């Protein structure tokens, strides 16, 4: 699996992910970019799960964003509907964390679109560790979203064998 974490604070939203790809219990690659920008750099997204499946979902999600003029929630709901009802898509195994200036969402293959409490997302095998670390930092420090995401990924990478210390980080800043 992997670890993807998203943190929102003080007008900034970050999605960060590690770079480890495994096949069974073997590390196949250590610098996979699991976080990317979509829809003219207005949306950021990260994935946990099968790499090929995730890239298929990124492509489908970007099409949904274009169909709905960048409206994140509508695009996410439409992707989740298709993912749940299409026989071929149902076989895809991945989770997506997506965010724009105003919303952060988790999209699952079960058709769920979840807006998490405190706009804190952590998915993948290291997700519970990253979530705990990020929550503690959000509640007890004045660190920015990027620093919190980096530290949360570092902690997850120290604990989870499927998470490494190669990070890809994308950030959006809300327009004033």
Swiss-Prot record:
Na(+) binds at residues 157, 160, 163. The keyword Disulfide bond does not apply. GO terms for biological process: proteolysis involved in protein catabolic process. It is found in: Cytoplasm. The active site is at 2. Allosterically activated by HslU binding. A double ring-shaped homohexamer of HslV is capped on each side by a ring-shaped HslU homohexamer. The assembly of the HslU/HslV complex is dependent on binding of ATP. This is ATP-dependent protease subunit HslV. It comes from Salmonella gallinarum (strain 287/91 / NCTC 13346).
């Amino acid at each position: 699996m992997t670890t993807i974490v998203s943190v929102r604070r003080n007008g900034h939203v970050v999605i960060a992910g590690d770079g480890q790809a495994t096949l069974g219990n073997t590390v196949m690659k250590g610098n996979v970019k699991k976080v990317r920008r979509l829809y003219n750099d207005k949306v950021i997204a990260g994935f946990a799960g099968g790499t090929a499946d995730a890239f298929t979902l990124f492509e489908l999600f970007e099409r949904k964003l274009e169909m709905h003029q960048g409206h994140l929630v509508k695009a996410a709901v439409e992707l989740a509907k298709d993912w749940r009802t299409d026989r071929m898509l149902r076989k895809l195994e991945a989770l997506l964390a997506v965010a724009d200036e105003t919303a952060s969402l988790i999209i699952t293959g079960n058709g769920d679109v979840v807006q998490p409490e405190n706009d804190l997302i952590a998915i993948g095998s290291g997700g519970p560790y990253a979530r705990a670390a990020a929550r503690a930092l959000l509640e007890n420090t004045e660190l920015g979203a990027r620093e919190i995401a980096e530290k949360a990924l570092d902690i997850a990478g120290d604990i989870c064998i499927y998470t490494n210390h190669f990070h890809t980080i994308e950030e959006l800043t809300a327009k004033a």
